Curated annotation (Swiss-Prot):
Keywords in alphabetical order: Cell inner membrane, Cell membrane, Membrane, Plasmid, Transmembrane, Transmembrane helix, Virulence
SUPFAM superfamilies referenced in this protein's UniProt entry, alphabetically: SMAD/FHA domain (SSF49879)
Physiological role: Required for the export process of the Yop proteins.
InterPro entries in UniProt: SMAD_FHA_dom_sf, T3SS_YscD/HrpQ, YscD_cytoplasmic_dom, YscD_ppl_1st, YscD_ppl_3rd, YscD_ppl__2nd
NCBIfam families cross-referenced by the UniProt entry: type_III_yscD (TIGR02500)
Stretches that traverse the bilayer: 122-142
Organism, as annotated: Yersinia enterocolitica
A Pfam short name: Yop-YscD_ppl_2nd
Stimuli inducing this protein: At 37 degrees Celsius in the absence of calcium.
Name the UniProt record assigns to this protein: Yop proteins translocation protein D
Length: 418
């Protein structure tokens, strides 16, 4: 069974939302909440529920949850259709398909969970006597129990630290708890699955705790959402090696935009420590390529043809020019990676010292592309001929092959070389 809830005050009054199964968080922090509420009275993590087919249970809340005016203990299965309050948050839920009430009748007076009966003086006296006996008994056992508690606590802390030493929690820090205070765990995890596993481990050991963890996946999604909202659709966001850092790749049109992205994300994404900004300025690759061609003395030997993510250098190649091109290509790749890719097109026929002997009769661009050579045999991509030529790629306009450490582009015209 699935469940749907409705809110009855604030900016989201009248909004109905179907609740996802599993751990469900209501709050104002978009990186920690499944259902984001933007009212100023809502805490970053305001209400935590566990949703399944049987119903909805209270897991945690920033303020006491009241059901029809009565406080609800943690772990309680909530009743559908009742008035539910968590501070400013006023809501209810029903099964999907059932009608939700248009308004909620909020109890004007809070009742005690149980009715209290008048106590007689004899009852009070017996209660005081029982309390004194209990305190005496606890005083006798107190020292031994406290020492045993300390020993158990040390063992549990050792187990927790062993868990935090694993790869999934290597960026989580445990602050040793003081007496009467919950354990504080801060740092970074990969995703919410790691958070839930850690939470279940601590709860199973009966440890009072407070998690102040940031999910790296939530950081990535938050940064991606902000960039797309601002129109930076050409930027890809990925996780950097360091905890709390993100890596950006792609293109923007101006240098000022690249500089603004870093400060923008660090201001808008909670928990983000820094950005490895590898964003390129559109057009810089072509300017740099022209400078490299001049630097290596190839500016008069090649013509440049840009095809999206591919840049072709066309010209006659000899061994000396090929060596210079290889150095140029290595420098270009170090600065810009494989996007765009440089490709050398030798328009001067076959190389003098490395005869290819590669005559294309026809090509097929079906599900498995292949070429037909002058021996009437079919060769797919990846095939190696007897003379050592490897077929790297088959395109409509060209076949790319390699021999030794050299690559060649054989231009086609209607499936035949030209």
């Amino acid at each position: 069974m699935s469940w749907v809830c409705r809110f009855y005050q604030g900016k989201h009054r009248g909004v109905e939302v179907e609740l996802p199964h599993g751990r469900c968080v209501f709050g104002s922090d978009p990186l920690q909440s499944d259902i984001v509420l933007s009212d100023s009275e809502i805490a970053p993590v305001h209400l935590v529920l566990m949703v399944d087919e049987e119903g909805i249970r209270l897991t945690d809340s920033a303020e006491p949850l009241l059901q029809e005016g009565l406080p609800v203990p943690l772990g309680t299965l909530l009743r559908a259709g009742t008035c539910l309050e968590v501070g400013f948050l006023l809501w209810t839920f029903v099964a999907v398909g059932q009608p939700l009430p248009e308004t909620l009748q909020v109890p004007t007076q809070r009742k005690e969970p149980t009715d209290r009966l008048p106590r007689s003086r004899l009852g009070v006296g017996l209660g005081v006597l029982s309390l004194l006996l209990l305190l005496t008994f606890l005083g006798m056992l107190g020292h031994g129990l406290w020492r045993e508690y300390n020993q158990d606590g040390q063992l549990v802390e050792q187990e927790v630290r062993r868990l935090l030493a694993t790869a999934a929690y290597k960026d989580v820090v445990l602050t040793s708890p003081k007496e009467g205070e919950p354990w504080l765990l801060t740092g970074y995890i990969q995703d919410n699955h790691a958070r839930l596993s850690l939470q279940n481990f601590l709860e199973s050991h009966g440890i009072p705790f407070r998690l102040e963890l940031r999910s790296m996946e939530e950081l990535r999604q938050g940064a991606e959402f902000i960039l797309q909202r601002l129109g930076y659709h050409g930027i890809e966001v990925s996780l950097a090696p360091q905890a709390g850092w993100l890596q950006l790749n792609g293109e923007v049109s101006e240098e000022i935009q690249k500089q603004k992205i870093d400060s923008l994300l660090q201001a808008e994404v909670p928990g983000l420590l820094g950005v490895e900004n590898k964003v390129r300025i559109a057009g810089n690759q072509r300017k740099r390529l022209d400078a490299l061609l001049e630097q290596f003395g190839l500016d008069s030997d090649f013509t440049v043809n840009v095809k999206g993510e591919l840049i072709e250098l066309r010209g006659q190649v000899n061994d000396e020019k090929l060596s210079s091109f290889n150095q140029l290509q290595q420098t270009f790749r170090q600065e810009f990676g494989n996007r765009p890719k440089l490709e050398l097109v030798n328009v001067g026929g076959q190389p003098q010292h490395d005869e290819l002997n590669f005559e294309v009769q026809a090509i097929s661009l079906g599900k498995v592309p292949y070429v037909v050579l002058d021996n009437h045999q079919r060769y797919p991509e990846g095939a190696i001929l007897n003379n050592g030529v490897r077929i790297l790629a088959i395109r409509r306009d060209a076949v790319i092959v390699s021999k030794g450490k050299r690559e060649f582009v054989i231009q086609l015209n209607g499936g035949k070389p030209r």
